[in-house]
Design a protein with these regions (language model features):
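Ubiquitin-like/PB1-type beta-grasp interaction modules and other compact soluble beta-rich domains
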Residues: 1-93
Length: 93
């Protein structure tokens, strides 16, 4: 079953400028690992040196933050859409 993963603008440079990618997987973790296997330069932007999802990378399944579900073990199905949303900090101090 193919799941759509939405790629944010700042990360499209690493996915051949694709706005979304269809991948096979049963969990968010499987999808993210498949994504970084297909687009290797993306890995360092999503995962740290220990293989953990970076703290500033937010992942949603149909608008639900996976941190409040089962994190990377969150199950997905064909009707789901996974969104990657990197946190952006800024402003004046």
């Amino acid at each position: 079953m193919a799941i759509r993963i939405l790629i944010p603008t700042p990360l499209r440079a690493y996915t051949e400028k694709k706005e979304s990618v269809l991948l096979e997987g049963n969990t968010v973790g499987e999808l993210l690992r498949g994504l970084t296997a297909t687009y290797a330069p993306l890995k360092k932007h999503l995962f740290d040196d220990t293989g953990s999802l970076r703290n500033f990378v937010n992942v949603y399944v149909n608008d639900e933050d996976i941190r409040y579900l089962q994190k990377e073990q969150t199950q997905v199905s064909e009707k789901d859409t996974v969104s990657i949303v990197p946190s952006i900090a800024g402003g004046r101090s």
